[in-house]
Amino acid sequence: MTTMTEQSVQVYAVFIRATAEQVWEAITKPEFTTKYFYGSLIDSTYEPGTPYTGWSTDRSQQYVDGEVIEASPPARLVTSWRAMYDEEAAAEPYSRVTWELEPAGEGVTKLTVVHDQLEGSPKTAANVAGGWSFVLSGMKTLLETGKPLSG
């Protein structure tokens, strides 16, 4: 996994032994996200302009608030992002998350996540700096083994 961590732009990339369609499902289906995304149930219709939200599995706590900016299955998803799990981060401006999927050989997909527009959001930048590596490692493990990385 490659990582570039700066205050305003963070880039993470991983190669996953799965098709782009399988990776897209893992990104967009809550039955997958709860197994690798810190237990978050990601909820969206993935139509531009619609909400993109992350919840605890019982929906008692909202973790992420955002909106779908662009969705081009199974190649690209762009959302706005505001962390709701931390009071200081929730007060910061929205940032942007871009998921890019590209074939990297037969049955292999390169997944790149770019989290940017973090200017003026130091708490969010610090929170997600370690988080994305864990999320992508969890997704890779789940898709390649059928088992979650932790828990």
Residue ranges and their predicted role:
Residues 86-133, 151:
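Beta-strand/loop substructures that line and gate deep hydrophobic ligand-binding cavities in soluble
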Residues 20-21, 69-76, 100-110:
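A short, structured loop/turn motif at beta-sheet edges
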Residues 11-12, 31-63, 76:
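Short beta-edge strand/loop motif at the mouth of beta-sheet-based domains
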Residues 141-151:
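Short, highly charged C-terminal tails/helix-capping segments
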Residues 23-24, 33, 52, 68, ...:
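Hydrophobic pocket/interface hotspot
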Residues 1-43:
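Hydrophobic ligand-binding cavity/cleft-lining segments
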Residues 13-14, 64-70, 95-103:
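Hydrophobic/aromatic beta-strand elements that line small-molecule binding cavities or substrate pockets
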Residues 4-8, 58-62, 89-93, 105-107:
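A generic structural micro-feature
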